[in-house]
Amino acid sequence: QVRGINFMIPHSFNPKSPYDRDYPPYFYNDGHEPRFPLYKVWADYTSRLSLMLTGGKHVCPVAILFSGNARRVGEYVTPEDMTTVLQDALYDCDWLPFEAFVSDASIEGNKLSLHEENYKVLIVPPTEVIPYETLAKVKEFFDAGGTVVGYGRLPSKSATVGKSSSEIVNLRNAIWGTNPEISNKACKTSTASGRSYFLPEKPDVKTITAAIKEDASIPPVIEVLEGETNNWLHVLHRVKDGKDVFFICNQDH
């Protein structure tokens, strides 16, 4: 639930229990499930969390651009690994579809707004092919003072009819510069103090922290002032009725 789930639906009920070997049932299991007496404890706990984590306003600093179709037309890396390392570094993030980014998101200075969400960092996925209008809006955000992060590879081909790959390369170079090197320091800055970064395909917590927190001066959702978390601490932040609600979870299983 620390990753954003706020409505739990139990499943795996099986009328053939306990004799179905293909899909063995859980929960009651005709009285054969020894953990069932504790199910109410778990269900009550998740119900309380669902109530606390529903409504209000989600506070999230990072948006990851995402496309389910980009991998069909060229090299593409899905955002799961980047999502995990961001959360390990105590940065919450949302996946933002290309289409929603272009049509619904607005740029307000160095922030990207979508409905009630406000993002300070925009991450462009490692993709070979990208729609022209998507990358053009990334450049607009960078020019307005936003922080843009690429990793692994930068786009080089157009997914838009009538727009050439050279036009994509021109936009890419305007954001990250020509032949940027992988570094936790900014590749390029805009006149409005926008910053662009090019990180490795699988960055670690140290790299994320060095680039986003230390170089771009964008703090994580919370900071651990004393002790070691071994990168297992994840956090979700909402504002409800004018009060901050933080759900802090130890993911070390």
Q: What is the predicted function of each stretch?
A:
Residues Q1-H253:
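Carbohydrate-binding surfaces of carbohydrate-active enzymes
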